[in-house]
Amino acid sequence: MKEKKNIPTTQSLLSSFDGSRKVYEKGSRPDILVPKREIALTQTVTQAGMIQNEPIRVYDTSGPYTDEHAHIDVTKGLNRLRAAWVEERGDTESYEGRHVKPEDNGYRSRNGSHQHIHTDFHHKPLRAKQGACVTQMHYAKKGIVTPEMEFIALREGLSPEFVREEVASGRAVIPANINHPESEPMIIGRNFHVKINANIGNSAVTSSIDEEVEKMTWAIRWGTDTMMDLSTGKDIHTTREWIIRNCPVPVGTVPIYQALEKVNGVAEDLTWDVYRDTLIEQAEQGVDYFTIHAGVRLRYIPLTVDRVTGIVSRGGAIMARWCLAHHQENFLYTHFEDICEIMKTYDIAFSLGDGLRPGSIADANDEAQFAELETLGELTEIAWKHDVQVMIEGPGHVPMDKIKENVDKQMEICKEAPFYTLGPLTTDIAPGYDHITSAIGAAMIGWYGTAMLCYVTPKEHLGLPNKEDVREGVIAYKIAAHAADLAKGHPAAQKRDDALSKARFEFRWRDQFNLSLDPERAMAFHDETLPAEGAKTAHFCSMCGPKFCSMKISHDIRNQSEEVKKEMEKKAKEFISGGSQIYSS
C-alpha cells in the first residue's frame, strides 16, 4: 500500500503576530496595495498623564498568510497579484508549454512512486512574443515606470523614478518571472534595504513536499525576502510547483541540480540539451532567478588544487568534473548568449554563481576565487546587452580583515551589479553555530555594500535544516541585514530601534516583545522567570531585580532632577520678586 501523503498545512500561520495587523498602502491604481505590518504601541505613563505612542509600520514579507481576512487554499495557490500588470503590457503570449516528464521528478518511468497530492494549479505558461523583451530592466531602460516599480517604491519609502534608474543602471534587480504572478514585487540593490535569502529543499536522504512548503511559509513569516529551492532528491518538479504557487516572495533555483538528476547523477553525462530543457521547465513554472555557474572555466580548475578545501560549491564541483572529463570549456560559458535568450523571454534574473568560492578561511581571496570573478564581470556585461538582470554571488568563508576587499573588487569588476553573498563565515571552528559565525560577516559585508545575504542555519555543514533551524537562520540574518541598514544610514532604518528603546526605558514590556524580530522568543525568555501578568508592567526584570535596575534608577534620577529644577525655578522667582538683591539690609 502506498504511503498516504499529507496536504501541506498552513493553518498555524494564518494569524499575525501579537499586537500587529496587516495593513496595505495604496498606490496610484486600485491593484497596487503594498503590505506592511503595523505594530500597535501602548501609552506612555508620565506624572502629567498618558501620552499616546503612534504605531510603527515595518516591511513585511509574509504575504497573505498573516492577513486575518485572507482565505488560503494551498492546493489552489495564492492570488495572481501581477497577472493583470503582465497582460496589459501586451508583449506576452500563453502557450501549451512542455509536458512534465518522469525524469523531471527524478524517475525513470511513469510507474515511479512519487508523491501525488491533488491540486488545482491551472498554470498555462507565458512567454515573450516573438522579438519582444519582457524584463524589468528593458522597461526601465526605456523610461517606463512599471507597476512593479511603483509597488517597490512604496515598500522602500523611495520614489518610483529612483527605483527605475537603479534597475536601468544594473545596480538593482527586480526578480519577477512573468509566470510567478503570485509574488509581491521586491528589489535587490545596495541603495535599498539589505535583503536576505533562505534556502529550503529536499535531499536524496530526507524531507517531503509538505515539509518544504511549510518551511517556505515559515521562513517568509520570519522575514526572508527571497527563497531558493535547492531540492536534490525525488519530486523536484512537484515540490517546486507547490512552493512557487504558494510563495509571495521571489523563488530562485540552481538548475544544474535537477539537470544532474535527469542524467542519474552522473556529471559526465550532462549535456547542453538536458540543461536547456531544465531551464525552460523551470522558467515555465515561474522561477524568478537562476544560479548559473558559468564562471567555472576549464583553465581555472587547476588553481584549486592546493586549496585546503578544494571546490565546495555543489554546482561548481559538478561543472568542474564535467570540464575535466571532456577536457572542454564549461558549456554554461559557451552557451551563455543562448541562456540570455531564455532569461529575457520570461524575465528571469541571473544569479551568477561563485562556483570557486572559498570553503575555508585558509582559501579566502585566493587566485581561483578572483579569476572566476573576472569572468563573472565579463558575463554581466553580456547579459546587460540583452537587458537581462544580473546579480553576482560571493563567498563563503572569509576572515573579517579580508571582507572589504571582496566588495571592492566585485563593485569594480562587475560594474556595481548587486552582490549576493553566503555569509561570509568569519571562522571555521563553530559547527552548530555557523548562523552566528556567518551573521558576523554578513553584517560587515552588508555594510560595505552587499545587496542580499544568503542565510546560514545552525545545521550548516552538518545536515538538512528543519523548520526551527530555518527560523534561527532567518532571524540571525534579519539582525545582520538590519545592522547593515543602520550603518549605511538607510532612511527610516532606525525608527523601529528607537521605538523599542523607548519602550524598554518606559518598561512597556509587551511593546518591547512586539517590536522585536522574534516576539515569541522575547516574551518566552522574559516569562521563564517572571511569568505573572503583573510582571509585564513591572519596572524591572529578573536580571537586576527591583533595586538594581539601571533604568529604574535613571527614572528616579530624572524625577529628582525635575524636582530640583522646579525648586531652583521657585528660588529664582523669589529672588527676582525680592528686588534681585544679593544682600538684604
Swiss-Prot record:
Annotated Zn(2+) binding sites: H397, H461
Cellular component aspect of the GO annotation: cytosol
Biased composition range(s): Basic and acidic residues: 89-107
Pathway in which this enzyme or protein is active: Cofactor biosynthesis; thiamine diphosphate biosynthesis
Names of the cofactor(s): [4Fe-4S] cluster
Start and end residues of each stretch annotated as Disordered: 89-116
Cofactor note: Binds 1 [4Fe-4S] cluster per subunit. The cluster is coordinated with 3 cysteines and an exchangeable S-adenosyl-L-methionine.
Binding sites annotated in the UniProt record for [4Fe-4S] cluster: C541, C544, C549
UniProt: substrate binding residues: N199, M228, Y257, H293, S313, R314, G315, D354, G355, L356, R357, E393, Y420
GO MF term set: 4 iron, 4 sulfur cluster binding; carbon-carbon lyase activity; zinc ion binding
Enzyme class: lyase
InterPro entries linked to this entry: ThiC, ThiC-associated_dom, ThiC/Bza_core_dom, ThiC/BzaA/B
Keyword check for Lyase: yes
Catalysis performed (reactions): 5-amino-1-(5-phospho-beta-D-ribosyl)imidazole + S-adenosyl-L-methionine = 4-amino-2-methyl-5-(phosphooxymethyl)pyrimidine + CO + 5'-deoxyadenosine + formate + L-methionine + 3 H(+)
EC numbers for this chain: 4.1.99.17
Alphabetically ordered keywords of this record: 4Fe-4S, Iron, Iron-sulfur, Lyase, Metal-binding, S-adenosyl-L-methionine, Thiamine biosynthesis, Zinc
GO BP term, pick one: thiamine diphosphate biosynthetic process
Pfam families assigned: ThiC-associated, ThiC_Rad_SAM
Zinc in keyword set: yes
Function: Catalyzes the synthesis of the hydroxymethylpyrimidine phosphate (HMP-P) moiety of thiamine from aminoimidazole ribotide (AIR) in a radical S-adenosyl-L-methionine (SAM)-dependent reaction.
HAMAP family from the UniProt entry: ThiC
Family designation: Belongs to the ThiC family.
Name of the protein in question: Phosphomethylpyrimidine synthase
Lineage: Bacteria, Bacillati, Bacillota, Bacilli, Bacillales
